[in-house]
Swiss-Prot record:
Residues 36-60, 89-112 bind DNA. Residues 136-145 have a biased composition (Basic residues). It is found in: Nucleus. It comes from the Eukaryota. This is Transcription factor DUO1. Disruption phenotype: Loss of male fertility. Reduced expression of germline-specific genes (e.g. MGH3, GEX2 and GCS1). Blocked generative cell division resulting in the formation of bicellular pollen grains at anthesis. Pollen fails to enter mitosis at G2-M transition associated with reduced levels of CYCB1-1. Blocked generative cell division followed by endocycle during pollen maturation leads to single larger diploid sperm cell unable to perform fertilization. Enhanced polytubey (e.g. multiple pollen tubes entering ovules). Transcription activator that acts as a positive regulator of male germline development by promoting both gametic cell specification and cell cycle progression. Binds to canonical MYB sites 5'-AACCGTC-3', 5'-AAACCGC-3' and 5'-AACCGT-3' in promoters to trigger the expression of male germline-specific or enriched genes (e.g. MGH3, GEX2 and GCS1), including those required for fertilization. Required for sperm cell specification leading to pollen maturation by activating a germline-specific regulon. Induction: Repressed by the microRNA 159 (miR159); the production of miR159 is stimulated by the anaphase promoting complex/cyclosome (APC/C). Activated by ARID1 in male germline cells via specific histone acetylation regulation (e.g. H3K9Ac). InterPro entries: Homeodomain-like_sf (IPR009057), Myb_dom (IPR017930), Plant_Male-Germline_Reg_TFs (IPR053106), SANT/Myb (IPR001005). Residues 8-64, 65-116 form the HTH myb-type domain. Confined to inflorescences, especially in stamens and pollen. GO terms for cellular component: generative cell nucleus; nucleus. Transmembrane segments: none annotated.
């Protein structure tokens, strides 16, 4: 037990020193890169055979390509061998002079990370380009907007077509592929859509407007009034001087009726009452038995 403990204490671990590297190089020059376990048995180094081999392969070989990037041929070789052997980095490194298994492993891991980053960026770009929110912001652009015309039959507004504008983009649940710049048409339900905000007085206004227009047309056609036309008709009578009277008369030619005014009311008949008759006239207006029910005034 004590011997085994002593041997374990003799095995050295940790970083290598320059003196140990020099002993290992001299051993390889003399015996070649083999018999790694004999180095410790001969008492040359207190290192295990595995530690001596890895130190030589990864750090002390003369043809190592330390700090050099993989060439295009080396990258192609690693990709082909990895698809054939899998993650056998030490075996793949034997096909690449000057490359260690750690070099191959580091190259492969960095390549995988780079590819994953590229794929992630491309997926983000594709998802943002096909995002429905970004595509919905360009829908519903009304270009051919037709105004609402006024009906000639009345004062109501008749809605013929409903157009799509940018202000109702949030209210119309259609995509840009379905709507676009086209005009939405209402289905024919047999009902005429009319809006008459002043329908309570349209009939009266229209009637007055038509009557006044007809009167204006008649006045434009016949410039003389009915009374003037009657007077002109009487001029053909040979006794029209008797009708008109002398020219120097101050009285009017003829008295025309006033059709636009009501006839004057009948004048009231009033008689003059003297001062002496005022009291009697005032009392005569009361009935005769008015004072029968009045109590006499008591004497003082």
């Amino acid at each position: 037990m004590r011997k085994m403990e002593a041997k374990k204490e003799e095995i050295k671990k940790g970083p290598w020193k320059a003196e140990e590297d020099e002993v290992l190089i001299n051993h390889v020059k003399r015996y070649g890169p083999r018999d790694w376990s004999s180095i410790r048995s001969k008492g040359l180094l207190q290192r295990t055979g595995k530690s001596c081999r890895l130190r030589w392969v990864n750090k002390l070989r003369p043809n190592l390509k330390n700090g050099c990037k993989f060439s295009a041929d080396e990258e192609r070789t690693v990709i082909e061998l990895q698809s054939e052997f899998g993650n056998k980095w030490a075996r793949i490194a034997t096909y690449l002079p000057g490359r260690t298994d750690n070099d191959v492993k580091n190259f492969w891991s960095s390549r995988q990370k780079r590819l994953a980053r590229i794929l992630h960026n491309s997926s983000d770009a594709s998802s943002s380009s096909f995002n429905p929110k970004s595509s919905s912001s360009h829908r519903l652009k009304g270009k051919n907007v037709k105004p609402i015309r006024q009906s000639s039959q009345g004062f109501g507004l008749v809605e013929e077509e409903v157009t799509v504008s940018s202000s109702c983009s949030q209210m119309v649940p259609y995509s840009s592929d379905q709507v676009g710049d086209e005009v939405l048409r209402l289905p024919d339900l047999g009902v005429k859509l009319e809006h008459q905000p002043f329908a309570f007085g349209t009939d009266l206004v229209l009637a007055e407007y038509s009557d006044s227009q007809n009167d204006a047309n008649q006045q434009a056609i016949s410039p003389f009034s009915p009374e003037s036309r009657e007077l002109l008709a009487r001029l053909d009578d040979p006794f029209y001087y008797d009708i008109l009277g002398p020219a120097d008369s101050s009285e009017p030619l003829f008295a025309l009726p006033q059709p636009f005014f009501e006839p004057s009311p009948v004048p009231r008949r009033c008689r003059h009452v003297s001062k002496d008759e005022e009291a009697d006239v005032f009392l005569d207006d009361f009935p005769a038995d008015m004072f029968d029910q009045v109590d006499p005034i008591p004497s003082p």
